[in-house]
UniProtKB/Swiss-Prot annotation:
Annotated region described as NMP, given as residue ranges: 30-59
Known catalytic reactions: AMP + ATP = 2 ADP
CC per GO annotation: cytoplasm
Residues holding Zn(2+): 130, 133, 150, 153
Protein name per UniProt: Adenylate kinase
Pathway: Purine metabolism; AMP biosynthesis via salvage pathway; AMP from ADP: step 1/1
Family: Belongs to the adenylate kinase family.
Annotated positions binding AMP: 31, 36, 57-59, 85-88, 92, 160, 171
SUPFAM superfamilies the record matches: P-loop containing nucleoside triphosphate hydrolases
UniProt xrefs under InterPro entries: Adenyl_kin_sub, Adenylat/UMP-CMP_kin, Adenylat_kinase_CS, Adenylate_kinase_lid-dom, P-loop_NTPase
Originating species: Geobacillus stearothermophilus (Bacillus stearothermophilus)
GO terms for biological process, alphabetical: AMP salvage
Amino acid sequence: MNLVLMGLPGAGKGTQAEKIVAAYGIPHISTGDMFRAAMKEGTPLGLQAKQYMDRGDLVPDEVTIGIVRERLSKDDCQNGFLLDGFPRTVAQAEALETMLADIGRKLDYVIHIDVRQDVLMERLTGRRICRNCGATYHLIFHPPAKPGVCDKCGGELYQRADDNEATVANRLEVNMKQMKPLVDFYEQKGYLRNINGEQDMEKVFADIRELLGGLAR
């Protein structure tokens, strides 16, 4: 079961990744984790990636693909994998397809957790944090008993600067522009499966299970 998981910030991708990994026993492979592991192991590609990252540069695709290849060749990926955060571009998607063919594998599905922008805005701008004790709330999913007041210590709740509407809208726009060509690419290839991410998280996972045939471990 070889999967790629896609979704904009706030779509609930992390939650669904955890559920897929628990149900199917395949490793959750994120770009950040891959880079950190390769650098820790001191592999030639890991050391190359570290040089770029230490300079604040983007890691070139050929290095990233090499690290992905090394990761997918490990024993825990023999029954499948869940790629998250990679590929990010059509060039990376094409390179991934070539690399998988080289090792005799191919993708089964690209799962796209689809949520409208207005719903994402609501989710991402709803976070509130207590100035006093740091407790986290959400205006929709975990509201305080009294608006603007922390349940735990009575402190004032505030919205972080990076959670305000202008910042969130810009982040979503950047991500949407980056992701749309990738969605189109995988749709043309026949791998893409859209899952309605506006439902309850258990219903979202039920839809994913149905797509994957409900074959839990």
